[in-house]
Amino acid sequence: MVRAVAVLRGDSKVSGVVTFEQVDQNSQVSVIVDLVGNDANAKRGFHIHQFGDNTNGCTSAGPHFNPEGKTHGDRTAAVRHVGDLGNLESDAQGNIKTTFSDSVISLFGANSIIGRTIVIHAGEDDLGKGTSEESLKTGNAGARNACGVIGIAV
């Protein structure tokens, strides 16, 4: 079992922890999300970005992690960036506590997310279904509310 964790912070009031667990390189990754400070009852884009660099805040994390050069899509789409994790939805208090599994990201090999940055955005991800060219790159999810580098955990 490999376990990785990211502590998210940013210029907004959003903060929290995202944990990733994978039994072996052939299994799905469990993603455990615990975030606070979001707007109430809101959907927010959730992506893994290319770089583990937060020296200039979340901006220096670069674009979505996309080693296969695909267009943007939903977490469940056949065509998507490796880093596309769709939307998270907050409750009436602005908290997000959820767990899901993903078979595209990995804690092993070429699609490893270790050392990259996880970002929660200020807006809802249109999942690549918008009318602008930006939709196919970012999902028009807006500013980067909070982020954290994904590191190996015990």
UniProtKB/Swiss-Prot annotation:
Gene Ontology biological process terms, A to Z: cell redox homeostasis; intracellular copper ion homeostasis; intracellular zinc ion homeostasis; removal of superoxide radicals
Domain of life of the source: Eukaryota
Function noted in UniProt: Destroys radicals which are normally produced within the cells and which are toxic to biological systems.
Residues annotated to bind Cu cation: 47, 49, 64, 121
Catalyses which reaction(s): 2 superoxide + 2 H(+) = H2O2 + O2
Gene Ontology CC entries for this record: cytosol; mitochondrial intermembrane space
Free-text remark on how the cofactor is bound: Binds 1 copper ion per subunit.
Alphabetical keyword list: Antioxidant, Copper, Cytoplasm, Disulfide bond, Metal-binding, Oxidoreductase, Zinc
EC numbers: 1.15.1.1
GO function term, MF aspect, one: copper ion binding
CDD domains noted in UniProt: Cu-Zn_Superoxide_Dismutase
Protein name: Superoxide dismutase [Cu-Zn]
InterPro entries according to UniProt: SOD-like_Cu/Zn_dom_sf, SOD_Cu/Zn_/chaperone, SOD_Cu/Zn_BS, SOD_Cu_Zn_dom
